[in-house]
Every structure is written in structure tokens, then in C-alpha cells.
Design a protein with these regions (language model features):
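Conserved, structured core segments of small domains
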Residues: 2-225
Length: 225
């Protein structure tokens, strides 16, 4: 029996974790980048995105979540970005991702326009934990139920905005809502994956949302599965 085309082309989510290289080129290409990102959202190819900020308040990269039918299609979106075309990036990691937990209200409240000019800012601060796991799959499986329960508790308390594993199960993205970086980092450090040594490494950065398409942020599986 032939598999339906609609099934074959079911969209997938891809994280693009970007680090800036040449800041002068970033500045020169920023307007074109904003326009490109707006177009992707309008076409249903960009779920959410915005700059990553370090502890000193410097914008050092980007975190985008694309929706595409294949990795090749998602890679095309990366390569056509004006920042990429301007050779302004130091690095990027494009990884297929599964969305397990989401708080759309938080994400919408955190959203701010990329060209906002009225000086206002969102009262919601988000912090992204971009994690890599150790290879021990048996340990990962043993700790996962406690990790899920912990994430559900954070989501219920309004402290978790996004959560889910990489498709290859070698890492995950966890986005926390907190007034301060220290508070958000404490949520990551209290995760059973952190306590039990599942996390091999992580990067932890504030994430400023500059555009969101809530219709694309549907769960790939339930928080309890």
C-alpha cells in the first residue's frame, strides 16, 4: 500500500543554536535578517526565535525553532538567512527536536518586536538551557520518569516555557521563566537529569523572543509519555 504524501511530508521541528562571529556584519545584515524571519513565520516555517544574551547582557547568538519536512529543508532556511549569507556567524547547530512541554501564554507575553522603537520591554524573562546528555542510555531511561515529573511541576507553576529532547536523544532544550538568571539556573540544576549526572554539558543563556507563531508550537507527544 502506498504511504500517503501528507504523511511523508509531516513537518518536523528543528532547533538552530547560533553563535555570532563578526558583529559588524551582524549589525549590517540585521534589518534584512528581521525581514527574512518575518517571512518565515508568515509562511509557517519559523515557530519562534530571537537573540541569546550572556551574563554581561551581550547578544552573542540566536536560537530559532524551524518547522520543515526534512533536515535538508531546514538547512536551506539556515543557509538563506541574511546573517549566514553575510558570513557573520561563528557557528550553528541544527538539530531535530521534539516538543513535549509548552506554555504558549508565557511565550506570547515574552514576545517583543525585533524593531521595537517605543522602549518598552516584556516583563517575562526566559532562559534557555541547551543541554547535551551522556551516552549511557540505561541511565537516561532510568531517570527519565523523574525528569518528566519535574518538568510537569515547573510547567504547572508557570516556570517552564518550552521543553523537549533532541530527536536523537542526545540532548534537550529547556526554557525557563524567571525574574533572574540565578533563579532560572537553579531550575536546571535541580532537574533529576542534572542531579543524577545525565547532563554531560549545557549552555545557559537568556533568550529574547523576537517573534512567535503559536500555531506551530504544538506538542509532538504528551508531557507524560
Amino acid at each position: 500500500m502506498t504511504t500517503p504524501v501528507a504523511y511523508l511530508e509531516r513537518p518536523m521541528k528543528f532547533i538552530n543554536f547560533v553563535k555570532y562571529g563578526d558583529l559588524d556584519r551582524i549589525a549590517a545584515a540585521r534589518k534584512a535578517h528581521f525581514a527574512y524571519a518575518d517571512g518565515l513565520r508568515a509562511r509557517g516555517e519559523l515557530a519562534i526565535g530571537g537573540p541569546l544574551v550572556d551574563e554581561q547582557g551581550r547578544r552573542i547568538g540566536l536560537l530559532f525553532i524551524y518547522e520543515a519536512v526534512s533536515r535538508e529543508a531546514a538547512l536551506g532556511l539556515v543557509q538563506e538567512d541574511p546573517f549566514t549569507l553575510a558570513n557573520a556567524l561563528r557557528s550553528y547547530e541544527l538539530i531535530e527536536w521534539r516538543l513535549r512541554g509548552v506554555n504558549l501564554d508565557l511565550l506570547v507575553k515574552a514576545n517583543r518586536s525585533g524593531d521595537q522603537s517605543d522602549g518598552s520591554s516584556s516583563p517575562v524573562r526566559l532562559f534557555a538551557g541547551y543541554t547535551k546528555y551522556r551516552v549511557d542510555q540505561s541511565r537516561l531511561a532510568a531517570v527519565r520518569p523523574a525528569h518528566w515529573k519535574y518538568d510537569q511541576a515547573l510547567e504547572g507553576a508557570g516556570k517552564m516555557a518550552l521543553a523537549g529532547p533532541f530527536a536523537d536523544d542526545e540532548g534537550g532544550l529547556f526554557v525557563y521563566n524567571a525574574a533572574r538568571r540565578e533563579e532560572a539556573l537553579s531550575y536546571l540544576k535541580q532537574d533529576p537529569f542534572a542531579v543524577e549526572g545525565v547532563f554531560a554539558s549545557y549552555e545557559f543563556l537568556e533568550w529574547i523572543i523576537e517573534g512567535v507563531n503559536p500555531a506551530l508550537l504544538t506538542r509532538d507527544f504528551s508531557s507524560s509519555s
